[in-house]
Curated annotation (Swiss-Prot):
Species of origin: Gallus gallus
Keywords noted in UniProt: Pyrrolidone carboxylic acid, Secreted, Vasoactive
Record's keyword annotation contains Transmembrane: no
Any one Gene Ontology BP term: blood vessel diameter maintenance
Record PTM Pyrrolidone carboxylic acid, positions in chain: 1
Family: Belongs to the neurotensin family.
Compartment(s): Secreted
GO cellular component: extracellular region
Protein name, as recorded: Neurotensin
Function: Smooth muscle-contracting peptide.
Length: 13
């Protein structure tokens, strides 16, 4: 699942 954190940097959980 692809999510975007508050810093607008993509990361995968």
């Amino acid at each position: 699942q692809l999510h975007v954190n508050k810093a607008r940097r993509p990361y995968i959980l």
